[in-house]
């Protein structure tokens, strides 16, 4: 398998990547610099994409031969997957986004594990983008100007039950390979985020799905498990343009396609300032995991919002015990979801973790992870809305301090970052010249307007030196690296 023009034909099943072929250490550098190793990895990626397409076409009853080729732009950290003639998704099935976007995630994972740095992945179909085939349907609507003072948000949490035609069977839209159903789990994340946005950002929050536990009359399922389409049908029965865009479609799952569009249609109807969509991700490979945030390929102006949210999620999630190494992407990714294309306001999609990975499933069911991840989403949005940059929390250096014996002295502290109040400054002992004479302290600060200052005291009659380590910790558990300084008790 040499050269970059290897284009496998869809004929096989099974994953071509497994743990032994993933690069590490010196192999990563080799793949990036060795043309032969690079070509080998690209060929393996092409085989993996072809294998996934085979299974997808088998499941849809449309198996046929389709070539697949891949090009990677190392400079722009991007990948282009090109399908040959015979595969062209259409409006029925929402342009296969529930197949193509998970495929992109797995290809990104395998590329990075093999030593190729990839962030954005796009697709061509016989040499053209989907927008070239469907220019009217996939056009991004004109975007409203972002208001300096924002007042409202739509939180859209996952999918929910839809009805299949013609038998009218009711099914969840997402699989649950490890027993965690995204369609029932994500609304609790929406509840968490709604409370945080209302409390910390001061916005009115609307929800795309009902949270009622009463039964939906037609399905007999709880309203809170139904998709947005049926909730909006109940709210606006006359607005079929909002929730019933494909009444004449022959597709069995046409109401799934309508549901994807109903959520941003509702955001446009409300005129909210931002749309935040929450999901869990899934992959054919149980190895793929972690937190991702997406903006639409044709709405690059939404990338700063997506990056800010991802940055804040990383900061707060990794501040929690047990989650210091939780995988979170460094940069948001461009994709072509319908959910964040149709909205006329900034719209991003948060894939909190993978419901197909055992470690991620454990995290998704942990209230600590749920709270931390949604605090990150809210904080990232709030910083973006205020024009602030997400940056690490860090204490400024603290100079050594002399304090007269039997007196005290206030010492001001500076920091960078955007901590959540109340704050605590924790002073721990590194050394003390007189055993038992020095005491660790914690000082709490509730008012973000007042400057930070700690009081250092020398209460005894004798002189001496204590070396202290200071840590600034915020209400979300985010802490600075320790800063060491000395306090000397001196005679006047």
Please place each PLM-identified region on the residue numbering.
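Short edge beta-strands and adjacent turn/loop segments
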Residues: 54-84
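A short amphipathic beta-strand at an alpha->beta junction
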Residues: 104-136
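Active-site histidine-acidic residue metal-binding/catalytic motifs
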Residues: 140-264
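A short, glycine/acidic-enriched catalytic loop
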Residues: 168-178, 281-307
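Active-site-adjacent mobile loop/cap segments within catalytic or ligand-binding domains
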Residues: 277-289, 294-295, 325-391
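Short, compositionally biased P/S/T/A/G/V-rich stretches that sit at domain boundaries
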Residues: 383-407, 437, 492
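Low-complexity "stalk/linker" and mucin-like segments enriched in Ser/Thr/Pro/Ala/Gly
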Residues: 398-400, 431-451
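Short beta-strand elements
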Residues: 477-492
């Amino acid at each position: 398998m040499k050269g970059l023009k290897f284009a496998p034909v869809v004929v096989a099943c099974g994953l071509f990547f497994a743990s032994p072929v993933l690069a590490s250490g010196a192999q990563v550098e080799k793949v990036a610099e060795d043309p032969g190793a690079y070509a080998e990895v690209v060929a393996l990626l092409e085989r993996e994409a072809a294998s996934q397409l085979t299974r997808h076409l088998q499941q849809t009853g449309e198996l046929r031969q389709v070539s697949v080729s891949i090009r990677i732009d190392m400079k722009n950290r991007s990948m282009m997957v090109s399908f040959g003639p015979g595969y062209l998704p259409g409006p029925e099935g929402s342009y296969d986004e529930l197949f193509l976007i998970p495929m992109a995630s797995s290809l990104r994972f395998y590329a990075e594990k093999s030593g190729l740095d990839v962030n954005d992945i796009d697709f061509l179909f016989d040499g053209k983008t989907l927008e070239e085939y469907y220019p009217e349907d996939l056009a991004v609507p004109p975007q409203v100007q972002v208001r300096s003072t924002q007042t409202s948000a739509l939180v859209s949490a996952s999918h929910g039950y839809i009805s299949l035609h013609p038998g009218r069977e009711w099914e969840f839209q997402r699989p649950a390979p490890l027993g965690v159903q995204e369609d029932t789990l994500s609304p609790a994340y929406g509840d968490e985020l709604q409370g945080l946005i209302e409390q910390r950002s001061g916005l009115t929050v609307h929800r795309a799905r009902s949270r009622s536990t009463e039964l939906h009359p037609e399905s007999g399922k709880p309203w809170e498990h139904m998709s947005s389409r049926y909730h909006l049908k109940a709210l606006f029965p006359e607005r079929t343009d909002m929730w019933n865009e494909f009444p004449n479609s022959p597709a069995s799952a046409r109401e799934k396609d309508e549901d994807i569009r109903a959520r941003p249609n509702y955001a446009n109807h409300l005129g909210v300032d931002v749309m935040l969509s929450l999901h869990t991700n899934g992959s054919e490979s149980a190895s793929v995991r972690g937190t991702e945030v997406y903006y639409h390929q044709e709405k690059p102006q939404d990338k700063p919002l997506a990056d800010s949210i991802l940055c804040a999620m990383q900061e707060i999630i990794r501040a929690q015990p047990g989650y210091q190494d939780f995988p979170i992407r460094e940069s948001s990714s461009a994709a072509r979801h319908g959910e964040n294309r149709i909205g006329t306001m900034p719209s991003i999609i948060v894939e909190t973790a993978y419901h197909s990975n055992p470690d991620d499933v454990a995290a998704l069911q942990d209230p600590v992870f749920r709270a931390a991840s949604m605090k990150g989403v809210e904080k990232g949005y709030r910083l973006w809305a205020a024009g602030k940059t997400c940056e690490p929390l860090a204490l400024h250096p603290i100079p050594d301090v002399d304090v007269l014996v039997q007196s005290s002295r206030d010492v001001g502290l500076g920091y960078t970052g955007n901590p959540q109040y109340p704050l605590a400054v924790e002073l721990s002992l590194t050394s003390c010249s007189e055993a038992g004479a020095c005491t660790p302290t914690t000082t709490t600060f509730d008012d973000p307007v007042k400057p930070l200052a700690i009081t250092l005291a020398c209460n005894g009659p004798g002189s001496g030196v204590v070396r202290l380590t200071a840590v600034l910790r915020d209400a979300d558990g985010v802490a600075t690296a320790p800063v060491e300084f000395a306090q000397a008790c001196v005679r006047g």
